[in-house]
Amino acid sequence: MKSVADVRDDIPFLKTGIIYLDNASTTPTPQPVLNAMLEYFNEYSANIGRGLHRATRRATEMFELARGKIARVINATPEEIIFTKNATEAINIVARGLKWRKGDKVVATVLEHHSNIIPWQRLERTDGVKLDLIPATPDCLIEPSAAEKIIDKKTHLVAVSHVSNAIGTIQPIVEIGKLARDNGALFLVDAAQSVGHMPVDVKRIGCDFLAAPGHKGLLGPQGTGFFYVRGDRFDELEPLLLGGGIVESVEEHSCKLVAPPQVFEAGTPNIPGIIGLGRACEYVIEIGIEKIAERERKLTEQMMEISKIEHVRVYGPKDVGRRGGVVSFNVGGVEHHQVAAMLDEIANVAVRSGHHCAAPAMRHLGVDGTVRASVHYYNLEEEVAKFIDVLEQIAQDFGRD
């Protein structure tokens, strides 16, 4: 079990003095993850699965070990894990890989990241698929009763984020997944903001597919991610890419492809990144996923104190139990980008501002953007307190109703 101090000591980026509250965008990389990647470059920097020399054998072994480490985090088997460069790629594998018929329906929510909306919009144009969005409550929650009105027998796929990246609300994915199954639909979970932050069990969720990046909750490197496919669902998907590394044999006009999951990983992959992601999965397990979730709840509860500041409006539910480690807000009379810039300039506090790649969610709130603060296990109470103090000063000096 790693303490907060242990983890902070492991993250070189924090030694710059930054108060980093932009974890929903990307997280800093711990030194053990960097070391695993450097070890690849320094000791066995070879391609995988292409050759018999010892360097390529070791590279292949370490690459494949990462599959099992990822699987352990979400209670899957290694054979159900496809390596991707991010969650976006995983979602697009579903969009381009399933067999669609005119009139099929995809159900998402109004709160989705653009990566879980735009691929379905393309299917509307190219395949005659219909996209329906489940409405949210004023607090940006998706109620099962609202989902029940949208999901029907015409629904081929339900695609829902576990935690809203823009607002931080935790959605009832188990209940939504049951609605999908009851109507004969497939169920895809965008777990970009939950894996590594809280327990995620694909067996309990009952999903057919799950997409996640490596560079957020898992503390892994950018350009990595994974796609979980329930073992009996591989036959329903075509690979997104075809090429080297996924064939058993090739004739002039035909080829025989390898079995999943490798058939979905054409071309030379991000070998050091995936090895780093495997080490990152070990790292968050060493901390303890429950321990991470508990600490993030505590820090989020502290961040929610900003709702008491005059001129500050916080979006989403007051109940921290319905939130991940994300708090989205605005200061009346001050543009969201200006607030983020002032937090940076005054106190080296890093937050995100804008529509957070969730423009429909912003329209639901009636704003063009928000300021978003987001935590991880390593953040300190003192850092959150500093953020609150500086925000209060900004609101006092520049805010208005």
Please tell me what each predicted stretch does.
Residues 1-401:
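Pyridoxal 5′-phosphate
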